[in-house]
Every structure is written in C-alpha cells, then in structure tokens.
Amino acid sequence: MWASTWALNGFLAGGVSQMTSCHRMEHELSAVYDITHGHGLAILIPRWLKYVMNDDNAWQIKRLGTNVFGLDDSLSDREGAEKAIEALSDFFFKTLGLDSRLSDLGIDDKHFRDMAENACKQLGGTLHGFIDLTPDDIVKIYEMCL
C-alpha cells in the first residue's frame, strides 16, 4: 500500500513531463464508448506519440525504443523515435492482437469534440505534457485513431 501510494501520488514525478495528456484523453474515450482503459491507451499512445514528437522530445521517445524494445541506440533521435513508435504499435497490434483502430470497435467521431473539451476543462483549456494540447489537437489525435 505504501509503495503504490508513492507510485501514484505524483510527488516523484515533480518537474518531469508526463503522459498525463494521453491518459486524460483515454478517460474521456472510455467514459463515452465501450472500450477498456488499456485498449484505449494502446490505440491512442502510438498516434499521440506521432503527433507530439518534435526535435525537443524525440530523444525521450527514442529511449522507449532502446530501453524497452532493444532498438539501436546509434540511430538519430528522430529515426529512433519513429522506430520506437513502430515497435510499440507492433507489440500492441501484432503481438497482442488488439484492434488497432477505434473504427474497428464501432467508434465514430460523433463525440470527439465534446470529449476533447472535457479532457481540457479542469486544466484551463489545455492539456500539458511533451507539448501542450488544445481541444483541436485532441480531436486530430482521436481522428488519427479512426
């Protein structure tokens, strides 16, 4: 109990950019549609990573590839990040066999705008993370998942 409290209270992550934007986006997804949190994250995370990747954060995404998937560390940050996203997608959709698109689960874009606005509501209209996301950005990421 003590360890889980420390793991989840956010104190240890102070000053470090987090994936909280993606989690907030998925909570909206599973609140509206019949999809589990884990499956929603599996569909969202690769598209979210592609959307938010830039020259300032590509090295962090590349680290996912080298540390989790054993990808070549000598690749450029951008190339390593792209390969990491591909490896993550392959794991979710080929290895685990999960449906890879929201449309595979009968989900359409009907509620995307409301979901995006709800995801940002408590944070002043913007989700913070690798990059700040507005409701317009979130709708685009949801659409990438169709």
Language model feature labels by segment:
Residues I61, N67-L146:
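C-terminal charged capping/lid subdomain of soluble metabolic enzymes
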